């Protein structure tokens, strides 16, 4: 059944247009009703990033939860993984993160976590969505049973201590010059503080949120500012988080950007040497580079691929017993510690590897040469276009031409009327020709507007 509100990662859209106070309140009411089982008092934990619209959505959700008798604990600006961690820690029934991740400030969203700290399943999101269209007035609490709301003191310190405990107590970051870019987002206080407490010399940028500048020319999707600062202070490493701090990219001492594929390769190799991999392999998505797969194979590890989205990666990890997975974009999931992607915790694992090996970041984190990869978007009606015979023939011909020396991934976007066409292979010119041919066929099918 097609869903009206929930997408690939919760609910996301334009603030005060798609994401209105009314919708936020209804989501909280529906979620509160769903999670109120048993006679004890129930509670929700709410965190947010630094967008201006976060205040509006936060208070609307407080009204929703308390109206159905659920108490609310307000964390303020906190990373998404901190909300996931604090939900079970505070014995809450549900956790909420108000964020649109790497999107600009005009957007916002709602991510929901269960009492175990994991994102809700598709089935539970469908239940919540079904309740949105029903009359929740039948479930409203009596005046004496309304919920209470309060700010939680010390939540940031608790998360900082959690991140530090992912490293051995004897490990210090003393001697490392680190630039941390917090994207003017949710990690702007906790990330620099955690690195400083671990002994590093810290230079922080993207730590002056004003409600409007989240992800603006900073963060993991805009690394130019980080590269500049690394050169300026002659840092050993640069670390960039996104707006809700659940993804990370690295910049080495030479100012070169290192993506999630390279980070997974480095951590996998390091954990393999230490005997820490739960299985001889990792989990990544269809979009991860073929070079990663070849590198892992060369050291005796496998790569299990899933559909795009950190949720799919985590589901496969849990189902098959992996403890390392992620996405090229920098979502790195370390399930020994976290129930979701955690940019800071992943960065700490890289830093621990750098300290253990005693080598520059460029040597520690560059494990393979990426295969040339080309990604283009075509604005079309995906359902109609991908079913047309001509489009199918062009795609099949592309697969035939690449053979074992490359890959094609053609998939509809989960959030907009776009088909994403990704091709990779050893012959860049051939890949580009194949991708262009597929885009041309899609545009000729049912074009909206080519990008």
UniProtKB/Swiss-Prot annotation:
- Residues the record marks as active site: 101
- Please give the residue positions where the record annotates the modification Phosphoserine: 101
Q: Which GO terms describe its biological process?
A: carbohydrate metabolic process; peptidoglycan biosynthetic process; UDP-N-acetylglucosamine biosynthetic process
Membrane-spanning residues:
none
Which GO terms of the cellular component aspect does the record hold? cytosol
What's its job?
Answer: Catalyzes the conversion of glucosamine-6-phosphate to glucosamine-1-phosphate.
Q: Does the keyword Methyltransferase apply?
A: no
Write out the entry's keywords from A to Z. Isomerase, Magnesium, Metal-binding, Phosphoprotein
EC number per UniProt: 5.4.2.10
Protein name according to UniProt:
Phosphoglucosamine mutase
Q: Which reaction does it catalyse?
A: alpha-D-glucosamine 1-phosphate = D-glucosamine 6-phosphate
Cofactor names: Mg(2+)
Post-translationally, this protein is described as follows, namely:
Activated by phosphorylation.
What is the enzyme's main class? isomerase
Q: Where does Mg(2+) bind?
A: 101, 242, 244, 246
Name of one Pfam family that matches: PGM_PMM_III
Query: Could you tell me the gene encoding this protein?
Result: glmM
- Please name the HAMAP family in this protein's record: GlmM_B
The free-text note explaining how the cofactor binds reads: Binds 1 Mg(2+) ion per subunit.
Family in the record: Belongs to the phosphohexose mutase family.
List the InterPro entries.
A-D-PHexomutase_a/b/a-I (IPR005844), A-D-PHexomutase_a/b/a-I/II/III (IPR016055), A-D-PHexomutase_a/b/a-II (IPR005845), A-D-PHexomutase_a/b/a-III (IPR005846), A-D-PHexomutase_C (IPR005843), A-D-PHexomutase_C_sf (IPR036900), A-D-PHexomutase_CS (IPR016066), Alpha-D-phosphohexomutase_SF (IPR005841)
For this chain, one GO molecular function annotation is: phosphomannomutase activity
